[in-house]
Amino acid sequence: MMTLTGIIFGTMSCSTNVYDEEEYEKIIRYLSPVDSVDQRHTWMLTDSRMYQFNANAGSGITSVMVFTENPLLADTRAELINQASVKKGESASMMLCVPYAQDSLYAALVDSKGNYYVTAFAAGTREVDISDETVKAIGVPTVSIPTQTFTYLFEENFPEAGDYDYNDLVMRISTERTGKKELTIHVTIVAVGSDRQLAGALRLVGRRYEDIQTVGTIGAESFNDGVPEGSRYVFDNTDMLVQGNNGEAVINLFIDAHWAMTFDAYVEYGLFTRKKYNVSTSSGGDYQLRSTRTVSYVVTFKNETGLDNFTQAMLDPFVMAEYNGNVWETHLDAYRDAQILYDYPSPSTKVLPWALMVPARDFRHPLEGKEIGFRKKTPEGVVALFGAYMTEGHSFGEWVENYTTCRDWYKYPTENQVW
């Protein structure tokens, strides 16, 4: 991959590099694997919406829950999006993070005996009446219902062009309200396809450092347990809660993604060799298959203000890597200019993103070297779809060119190109 360092930074002195935005835009577009990018793109597959739920069914009602599917089906794949306390005759308002590809949702009033009074409603409906007339099923779920989980995909090369397999770091994150002033955030490292050190953190968007009472983990686990001194050069702070440049609260996830996924104090007598984890179909050479690793963070706030409406959209997970003598952060496109822990020039060019948030707990990330999927003219002038998500009418490449289409692309993997 052509390096941009010498092109976008003009040397003015032995110690100072000046960022050249115009040259950067020329080169990054030249290296792009797509012919065009919709300049309206936000690279979001979800929308945060406020809903009102009117509790008019059952008796002894204690709460209302909202699910992606019917939670009472025996083979349900439902996820809990959000919940709120409510009594019969009352209304509850909730912010929901709704995938654009989701046409319908399910609301359930829950009584003191654990019975669910379930009704379906169109995702575009903002006021939902749950009454004896609208309830379609009553019962108790026969399976445990997980909370809504999103998959986050990162390219390691920001601000340079990547290889667009989006597997340099893959995480799954879910949140649940576990107390009046408490959120529990579950973070799972699924894959590390990078061969260099990456650190990771999670900003609580709009939440100040001083708003947080404590941050701990279930079982006192940490991705930074036993991390060697030699791994502390990208981000050397092992405190679980740190303060961002703008005063916002930031959870320190890990200072070395490879160590976080593979930690074992007795492996190789403390010597640590980086491999690429879970981006191949078998172990061997530089590649290794490993179990995923999860740490659950318990965040206690000083007050409960706004927690009823806390959604996944208020999480800003990002990675940090060294580049051109500095440390650069890779965020979702919506937060690309955030610069939470480090300062650096921020490109404004609208090109392919370096990070994606996919509203799926079981998203299958591309194998190493397999691009996520693009639509491009061949040398013969024929427009072709290719990559790990290339199903016509449901492809990543078509979504790149028109942000209003193919918002369900993540449901259509190419079998031999995904993990």
Spans of model-derived segments:
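A eukaryote-biased signal for long
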Residues: 246-419
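Extended low-complexity, serine/threonine- and proline-enriched intrinsically disordered segments
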Residues: 58-75, 195-233, 238-240, 314-328
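Short, intrinsically disordered low-complexity segments
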Residues: 88-103, 109-111, 220-277, 281
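C-terminal motif of bacterial Sec signal peptides marking the signal peptidase cleavage site
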Residues: 10-13
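Asparagine-centered strand-capping/turn motif at beta-strand->loop junctions
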Residues: 55, 189-193
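Acidic/polar, low-complexity intrinsically disordered N-terminal segments immediately downstream
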Residues: 16-161
